[in-house]
């Protein structure tokens, strides 16, 4: 594998892993290469992202590397997030949002377990729309990100606090979480909790 191919593989892994990032050890295991080789390629790739003409950077958080946007470009991303708040959410995003709203703080993997499918794209959508955010790190291997709702979530759904969320049925069946998410949003609509936009 050439250096460019190695860097392309690292870049792809960072992209796929998203906010959780990937540790150097995980990269070495995935790529089946030594720490020295992977770290040198990663550092050179990270240096290439420091170019002013790039919108992304590679950062290290809690011993995990991840792709993130450059802070100086935040005003553009905020405009984008605010404009996309007006458009509808997919069924997957609605399910994910309902799970996070009721079970926060919660990791992506825990959301995946409840839904029975991967939720990374839905979480990225909800994060970009400022409806959820990172609220901490779980204990344990990799210290996964914990997600919770934001003040924008409360505002968007006309809630003063999370205590105003409609109660879920006590006999909730996790295998039918899509139906439960529909029930959640129907209850919110019936209670006139949605803003008319």
Curated annotation (Swiss-Prot):
> Which Pfam families does the entry mention?
SMC_ScpB
A GO cellular component entry from the record: cytoplasm
What is the superkingdom listed in this entry's lineage?
Answer: Bacteria
Q: Where is the major localization of this protein?
A: cytoplasm
Q: Which residues form a coiled coil?
A: none
Any idea which UniProt keywords this protein has?
Cell cycle, Cell division, Chromosome partition, Cytoplasm
- GO BP terms, alphabetized: cell division; chromosome separation; DNA replication
Disulphides? none
Places the protein is found: Cytoplasm
SUPFAM superfamilies in the record? Winged helix' DNA-binding domain (SSF46785)
- Cross-referenced InterPro entries, in alphabetical order? ScpB_csome_segregation, WH-like_DNA-bd_sf, WH_DNA-bd_sf
Free-text function comment from the UniProt entry: Participates in chromosomal partition during cell division. May act via the formation of a condensin-like complex containing Smc and ScpA that pull DNA away from mid-cell into both cell halves.
How this chain assembles, per its entry, is: Homodimer. Homodimerization may be required to stabilize the binding of ScpA to the Smc head domains. Component of a cohesin-like complex composed of ScpA, ScpB and the Smc homodimer, in which ScpA and ScpB bind to the head domain of Smc. The presence of the three proteins is required for the association of the complex with DNA.
* UniProt family annotation: Belongs to the ScpB family.
For this entry, the protein name equals Segregation and condensation protein B
From which organism does this entry originate? Halalkalibacterium halodurans (strain ATCC BAA-125 / DSM 18197 / FERM 7344 / JCM 9153 / C-125) (Bacillus halodurans)
């Amino acid at each position: 594998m050439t250096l460019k191919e190695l860097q392309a593989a690292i870049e792809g892994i960072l992209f796929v892993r998203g906010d959780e990032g990937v540790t150097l050890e995980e990269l070495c295991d995935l790529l089946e290469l030594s720490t020295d080789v992977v770290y040198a390629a990663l550092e050179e790739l990270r240096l290439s992202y420091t170019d002013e003409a790039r919108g992304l950077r590679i950062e290290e958080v809690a011993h995990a590397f991840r792709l993130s946007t450059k802070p100086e470009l935040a005003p553009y991303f905020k405009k984008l997030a605010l404009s996309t708040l007006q458009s509808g959410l997919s069924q997957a995003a609605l399910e994910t949002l309902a799970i996070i709203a009721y079970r926060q703080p919660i990791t992506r993997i825990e959301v995946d377990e409840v839904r029975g499918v991967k939720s990374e794209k839905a979480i990225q959508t909800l994060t970009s729309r400022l409806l959820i955010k990172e609220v901490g790190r779980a204990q344990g291997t990799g210290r996964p990100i914990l997600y919770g709702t934001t003040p924008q979530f409360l505002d968007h759904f006309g809630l003063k606090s999370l205590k105003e969320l409609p109660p879920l049925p006590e006999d909730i069946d996790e295998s039918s979480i899509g139906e439960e998410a529909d029930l959640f949003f129907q209850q919110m609509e019936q209670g006139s909790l949605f803003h008319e936009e």
